[in-house]
Amino acid sequence: MKKLYILLCGATVALLMAACQGGKTAAADAEAGDTLEMKYAKLLTIVKHGDGEETSDAAEGIDYQYAEALVANPWKAGTMLHRYILIPKGEEGDKTVAMLAKRRSTGARCTTDTVRTPVERSAVFIAPHCQLMYELGCQQAIRGVCDLDYINIPDVKKRVALSGNTSAGISIVDCGSSMAPDIERIIALKPEAILLSPFENSGGYGKLDKLHVPIIEAADYMESSPLGRAEWMKFYGMLFGNEEGKSNGISGSCESKADSLFAKIEKEYLKLKAEAGKLPKGLSILTERKTGNVWYVPGGQSTIGILLKDANARYIFEDDQHSGSLAMSPEQILAKGKQVDVWAFKYFGGAPLSQAQL
């Protein structure tokens, strides 16, 4: 049997990470405006609306009266998961809210939430998105987190430790498990938005749905490419700021930072992909670990599956056509992966695992 290498991945995932009509047809379901070009993302459509006049330049800048973000349903083609209306705060934004209230159709076929931007207080249930907010310089908007043990960001840990100290500045509340969040703590932190990962057939979000707080369904992990997932940062940049300012000594808005950061990631990713393509086929790889009686692995067309393909690795499920996770039995995994070169999985414990423990 080949020597098996065990890779223990940290909690921070790499940043490689439509209307009631799915995909790019979502723009047709939105009100007339300028559609932001999305080169890779297939599940997200953003339409910007200018102040009375629609111009082709509006989609490229950060000046707009309001914007629509349309999230396609990854699990039901041709339908929309959620629609967001992003309206800047302030008097002009108040007028826009009133204007839209008068003309908006009451027959919406999907959940629609109005979000006043920039969002200054949020509960973030997803560790990679916490890291992204630090990269964009809008970490001050993180006021609550879930699954704290999985967040490997020292400043988040420090701010959670300050929770309850009214003189401590911008602290963070530990809201418990993302699967069963502490509703009372979430209410107390007064979030303007809750950022979480949606799941197929979830049946809603229980008590969270009753808080009347916009729930941002971050379906980026269901994109069909790593760059498609990364491109969602343009949406998050719009959520957390379209005003010029300074954070961590870096000037500029979260929105403009998202554009420049994505351009940098795209350039580096394509460069590395091209270099990997020139090399001989890499090692075979198996991912993840057994959860209960099920072993969930990324589908061949998932962001992780495509990432491994672009890295020239031999992923054992690369021929699979699913963009989500595959639920396999341990027996199926052993039958297909017992001769793999590399076993890679996420692990959040304090000490390394041994083969005996696994």
Where are these regions (language model features)?
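Bacterial Sec-dependent N-terminal signal peptides
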Residues: 1-28
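N-terminal ligand-binding lobe of clamshell/alpha-beta domains
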Residues: 20-358
